[in-house]
């Protein structure tokens, strides 16, 4: 970015306990009086209140502009975006269980796009969400109250998922967490469906086939680990072995995260890197048990 990093901050806020099964986290992003250009990684769905400023995101041949409130459907690849400051954004990062329970929309059909509140929510809650930016600007609600209001909207919008659908989501997440290169047969064996049905349901809840989903999470997982300081050599070697060669590693990480290994280094200076960490991407255990032991983490803490 010309002139160096714009003055901005990214604050994660823990989701309320009752919403923890559905959300990665809440967050507040602030930008000073400058333009900020970056790339958002292939990330889960977001509910957003753009309280100040305006942003744009590139979706293939279309540039979409933000509104006061909107949903960002789950991303299947990294996307370029630009924000004109000053800006303040409030967000709820919705994991794949939450997206299915809140929206009821197939990720195969709705991904990599902005959605108006009425596409996801019933009319009353959609109107409430759309009015939050104006209420914040008028001083009727502060930061904490706005996030609380977003949580209330999510609570009102959640529906109960069939147990078999929850099984597909949770078993797929467990499978993705098990290895850099999990075996497809292991996934199919864990699901109460035929191979063809399993592929269709994985695409419905995650937007991509199991084969492509492995590519996506392998890249995100590798990017997360490479962004950590003092990465043990054994883990770095495991990352290298998961890709054909260095060129393949760079290509995959760039496609799914918008980063290169150099830009992921500690101190590289992008708050968007924080979204690749466990606070921002907690629906999948990005650290398998072997990596967790070497990093001194309890793998259960990464969910």
Sequence positions of predicted segments:
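A secondary-structure capping/hinge motif
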Residues: 202-208, 252-262
């Amino acid at each position: 970015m010309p002139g160096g990093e714009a003055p901005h901050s990214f604050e994660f806020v823990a989701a309320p306990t009752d919403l923890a099964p559905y959300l990665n986290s809440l967050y507040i992003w602030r930008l000073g009086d400058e333009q900020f250009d970056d790339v958002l990684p292939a990330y889960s769905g977001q509910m957003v209140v753009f309280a100040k400023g305006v942003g744009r995101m590139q979706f293939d041949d279309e540039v979409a502009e933000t509104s006061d409130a909107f949903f960002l459907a789950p991303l299947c690849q990294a996307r370029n975006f630009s924000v004109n400051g000053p800006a303040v954004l409030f967000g709820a990062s919705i994991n794949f269980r939450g997206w299915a329970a809140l929206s009821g929309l197939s990720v195969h059909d709705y991904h990599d796009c902005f959605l108006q509140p009425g596409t996801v929510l019933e009319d009353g809650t959609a109107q409430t969400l759309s009015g939050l930016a104006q209420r914040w600007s008028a001083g009727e609600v502060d930061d904490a109250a706005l996030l609380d209001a977003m949580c209330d909207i999510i609570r009102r919008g959640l529906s109960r998922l069939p147990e078999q659908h929850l099984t597909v989501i949770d078993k797929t997440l467990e499978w993705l967490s098990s290895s850099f290169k999990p075996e497809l047969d292991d996934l199919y064996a864990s699901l109460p469906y035929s191979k063809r049905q399993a592929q269709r349901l994985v695409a419905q809840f995650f937007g991509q086939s199991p084969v492509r989903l492995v590519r996506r999470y392998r890249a995100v997982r590798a990017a997360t680990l490479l962004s950590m300081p003092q990465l043990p050599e054994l883990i770095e070697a495991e990352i290298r072995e998961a890709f054909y060669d260095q060129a393949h590693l760079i290509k995959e990480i760039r496609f799914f995260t918008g980063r290169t290994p150099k830009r992921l280094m500690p101190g590289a200076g992008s708050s968007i890197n924080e979204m690749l960490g466990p606070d921002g991407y907690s629906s999948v255990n990005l650290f398998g048990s072997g990596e967790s032991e070497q990093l001194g983490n309890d793998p259960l803490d990464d969910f």
